[in-house]
């Protein structure tokens, strides 16, 4: 059994430390109030049993809470008072040096919490450590100086989650849709260097990767680009190559048809070379965030402005999917699944039915998904129904990064819809499980507590908004001055972009399943519990609309992915309420509105059921189905894609893509338990060295490849197949 020290280091559990601490507290009181050696040993044993029952590494603070409770249970009030006083004095000492120990432990690679925090960061690398060091300082400043103490306390206790406090000290926003079209067509500036409109497709792609890196270094959330914005440069290259071929063939007896063949062959070669940087540079770039950019590439034929551009876009999409299917090579030279870029493919009327002109692209996408877990899929049909602007027109567009969707918006200056160049200000998430447990199952109390917690989230969201107010465009020129998000003047404040629907701000939620299960005794898939689940969703939407109307800001409801926070929430719930069977007996809580990962339900029923809840998450959400190896059953994959097209706006298929560098095993790397800790192990050779294992799993929208904390690992282990 392990214990997590205050600096984040994970060490073996030592019962003698409990015995020593209680003995010192007991010796501080006189006479009959002192405990016998047997009583002290019993207390230590009881605490040890409680820790083992949690089936995870516990923190020092949790152990001390358990000791206090044991002392109070046996009426040892004087000893408990001395124990609590000692804790308080030590706490005051620590407050004089709030970050030193944590920073030193992460530099020495001893901080287990940091090691497991982000599935796409390697905390042993210097550049990542620098980001984490800055993050520790930011979190400390946020907690001590920048945030309302009530919000800080609620965050620490797991009532809410104030996202990305490791970046809150700076004036940074969350995620966005990069206006690559504006930057490529009208030029941009990168690091003080003017970049003019590119004269070839490959150059456009190279510039795009530089833009991606610059944008990622100036925000903390994901970004999305569209391949449509690169499509015009295919014809630029075609004409350039055609002129070169004409010059080469001048005076030779070469037919026009033969010349066209040569042009198309060279053009295809350039498209291949152009797409490669988007794949390879993105996964090898290191931004100031200490990781590869969280980039999503959008593939939507319906965005093309004319027939030629659509045909050229199809070529780019085909090449992008082919390269992703191939993968990237690991250190051993073996092709593996990369985490980025995330790919989103739009299912539409001319690519979803056999015989459609672009059906071959959907078949290729299905083949790639079966092997590499991407692309994910948006249904144009369903999105046009759900994303309707004030003029009654439906729109299809990509999410910002993983799942955060903008609200429909009509530019008041042009009267046209606008999506690229818009962004999200930030997220605060409510823990629905805590609301339910705090109510004790009383519905009247539930709604009262729910409103109190939502009001707290609202205040926290206002703090995020106020942190951006007054930000000069000079803070991030690539974003605010040179086209990624706007073309503001130097020194101009970004304030006008924070109101009127141009940007969004998100109320996140997590644990709907556990919330409903506790209040009704049933899963929200049960007909008797579903109405309550929908009423919870509607209530949060009503609050967002109320705040939006009062403040002229686009509050929207967001299905929080909870990559590492799922573990934090679970630990906080266990601390506050103990082990409640079926509710807090796991080291994770369920993402957003999802069906519980262990619930047996088929893929089609799951997608249909969750589509009703996705509709009520306008600020972002994604559904998934867990599938076995489908590489030899692409017909089944295509049937799922057809179902997605007809029934749900945004969904993905999860499979497994692993490799053991020690023995060459390329099947599923298993999760096994060792002394109360979940570890990854090759079932063929027993290798547990994470540096010699390539494991790719869907974390929560993105693919993770750097392993996960104990809560998320348990959630991955508990997943059942839906197909």
Predicted regions and their residues:
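Non-cofactor substrate-recognition interfaces
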Residues: 13-15, 421, 696
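Conserved catalytic cores of very large enzyme subunits
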Residues: 89-501, 522, 526-688, 694
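Contiguous, well-ordered alpha-helical segments that form the cores/surfaces of helical PPI scaffolds
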Residues: 299, 505-518, 538, 698
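Amphipathic, well-packed alpha-helical segments that form the structural scaffold of globular domains
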Residues: 23, 458, 462, 513-517
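Long insertion/accessory domains within large nucleic-acid-processing enzymes
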Residues: 684-723
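Charged, amphipathic alpha-helical regulatory modules used
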Residues: 1-110, 717-722
């Amino acid at each position: 059994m392990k214990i997590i020290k205050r600096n984040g280091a994970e060490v073996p559990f030592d019962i003698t430390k409990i015995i020593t601490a209680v003995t010192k507290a007991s010796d501080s009181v006189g006479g009959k109030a002192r405990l016998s050696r047997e009583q002290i040993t019993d207390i230590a044993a009881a605490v040890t049993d409680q820790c083992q029952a949690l089936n995870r590494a516990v923190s020092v603070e949790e152990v001390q809470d358990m000791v206090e409770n044991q002392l109070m249970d046996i009426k040892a009030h004087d000893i408990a008072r001395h124990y609590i006083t000692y804790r308080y004095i030590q706490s005051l000492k620590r407050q004089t040096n709030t970050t030193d120990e944590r920073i030193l432990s992460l530099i020495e690679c001893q901080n287990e919490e940091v090691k497991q925090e982000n599935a796409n960061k390697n905390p042993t690398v210097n550049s990542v450590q620098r980001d984490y060091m800055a993050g520790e300082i930011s979190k400390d400043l946020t907690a001590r100086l920048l945030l309302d103490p009530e919000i800080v306390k609620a965050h620490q206790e797991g009532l809410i989650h104030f996202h990305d406090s490791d970046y809150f000290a700076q004036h940074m926003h969350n995620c966005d849709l990069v206006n690559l079209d504006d930057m490529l067509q009208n030029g941009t500036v990168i690091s003080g260097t003017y970049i003019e409109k590119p004269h070839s497709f490959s150059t456009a792609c190279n510039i795009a990767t530089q833009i991606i890196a610059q944008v990622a270094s100036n925000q903390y959330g994901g970004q999305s680009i569209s391949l449509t914005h690169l499509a015009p440069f295919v014809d630029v290259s075609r004409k350039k190559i055609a002129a070169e071929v004409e010059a080469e063939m001048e005076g030779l007896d070469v037919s026009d048809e033969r010349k066209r063949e040569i042009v198309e062959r060279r053009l295809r070669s350039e498209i291949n070379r152009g797409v490669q940087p988007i794949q390879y540079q993105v996964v090898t770039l290191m931004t100031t965030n200490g990781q590869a950019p969280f980039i999503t590439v959008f593939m939507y034929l319906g965005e093309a402005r004319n027939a030629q551009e659509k045909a050229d876009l199809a070529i780019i999409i085909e090449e992008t999917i082919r390269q992703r299917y191939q993968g990237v090579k690991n250190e051993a030279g073996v092709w593996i699944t990369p985490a980025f870029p995330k790919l989103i493919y739009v299912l539409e009327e001319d690519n979803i039915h056999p015989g459609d002109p672009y059906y071959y692209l959907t078949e290729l996408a299905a083949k790639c998904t079966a092997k590499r877990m991407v692309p994910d899929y948006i249904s144009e049909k369903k999105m046009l129904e759900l994303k309707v602007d004030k003029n009654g027109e439906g729109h299809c567009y990509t999410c910002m990064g993983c799942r955060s969707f903008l609200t429909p918006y009509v530019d008041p200056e042009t009267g046209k819809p606008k999506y690229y160049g818009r962004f999200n200000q930030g997220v605060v998430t409510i823990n629905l499980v805590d609301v339910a447990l705090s109510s004790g199952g009383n519905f009247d109390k539930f709604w009262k507590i729910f409103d109190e917690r939502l009001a707290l989230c609202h205040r926290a969201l206002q703090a995020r908004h106020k942190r951006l107010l007054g930000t000069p465009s000079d803070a991030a020129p690539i974003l605010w001055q040179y086209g990624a998000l706007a073309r503001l003047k130097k020194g101009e404040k970004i304030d006008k972009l924070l109101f009127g629907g141009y940007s969004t701000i998100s109320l996140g939620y997590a644990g709907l399943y556990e919330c409903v299960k506790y209040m009704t005794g049933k899963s929200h898939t049960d007909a008797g519990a579903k109405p309550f689940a929908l009423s919870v969703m509607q209530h949060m939407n009503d609050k967002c609309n109320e705040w939006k109307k009062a403040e002229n800001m686009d509050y929207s409801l967001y299905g929080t992915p909870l990559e590492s926070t799922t573990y934090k929430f679970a630990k906080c719930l266990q601390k506050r309420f103990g082990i409640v069977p079926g509710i807090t007996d796991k080291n994770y809580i369920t993402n957003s509105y999802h069906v519980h990962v262990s619930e047996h339900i088929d893929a089609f029923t799951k997608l249909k059921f969750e589509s009703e809840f996705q509709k009520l998450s306008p600020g972002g959400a994604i559904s998934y189905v867990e599938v076995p190896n489908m590489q030899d059953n692409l017909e089944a994959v295509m049937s799922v894609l057809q179902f997605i097209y007809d029934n749900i706006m945004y969904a993905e298929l999860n499979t497994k893509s692993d490799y053991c560098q020690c023995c060459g095993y390329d099947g599923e790397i298993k999760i096994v338990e060792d002394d109360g800790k979940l570890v990854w192990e090759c079932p063929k050779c027993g290798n547990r060295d994470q540096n010699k294992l390539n494991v790719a799993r869907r974390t929560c929208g993105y693919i993770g490849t750097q392993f996960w904390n104990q809560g998320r690992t348990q959630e991955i282990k508990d997943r059942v197949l839906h197909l």
